[in-house]
Amino acid sequence: MFEDAASNPVKTLNISGKTRLCFIVGDPIAQVKSPASVSQAFHDAGLDALCVPAHVTPADLAGWIEHMSKAKNVDGLIATVPHKFACFAHCATASDRAVFLGAVNTMRRNQDGTWHGDMFDGMGYVEALTSKGCNPEGQRALIVGAGGAGSAIAYSLMTAGVAELAIHDEDHVRRDSLAGRLAGLNLGKVSIGSPDPRGFGIVINATPLGMKPDDLHPVVSGHFTSDQFVGCVITVPAVPPMIGVARAKGCNTMTGADMFARVCDLMVQFLIGAS
């Protein structure tokens, strides 16, 4: 249903039948910030293109992609929770890291109209970490969540040189699968983690926990110490409860918005064919 947008009036609309489209698909979708940021980036690059949100449930995703792909003016697709693994199955080609992870967050058209996918969550997260003064190399890291974003971040932490990566996820099958594949890279120690953050230099929440006011903290935040770096992938609220506790304890932190800014840059470069 249409909602009142009086508090956010549109100043200028330059849309025509020539405008190219990129969808961002998720369930839920109301929390995403990509439509405005990606659309602005298209404009800044001199492109007549828009990023449009689509709320699609997992049960409907395959049919939606099938029909959406028939639209000749759709050039790209951004996948968010929970569709990053499912969207990989719709890619005819993909980057090596996407193949390793079995997940994508961005898709663009091949010359024959099929989809080529890549995953930038991990690369963007580690670049954002570094910009915040946190060098992963040689550190012990705990990541909570082995979903699409968590898997990508875990992979990039390993390739960035962490000494040990502990993975915690309530879905033990998913957790163990990721741990096994990462261990096969022979880049560092991979272990099974828990919600206890003690002993880790880097602690990252890569789950949706914290989006709702009554969510439990993904880790035992009372155990944070001021020498830890604590990060989160959540963009709404701006300061998730876990991050609030970490800051109160003197930890350096990074929010989902910090990650999103870098991931957005990488996605746009991919979508416009600059990478």
Labelled PLM ranges:
Residues 100-106, 209, 223-260:
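ADP-ribose/adenylate-binding Rossmann-like module
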Residues 2, 15-132:
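Phosphate/diphosphate ligand-binding glycine-rich loop within oxidoreductases
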Residues 162-184:
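NAD(P)-binding Rossmann-fold cofactor-contacting core
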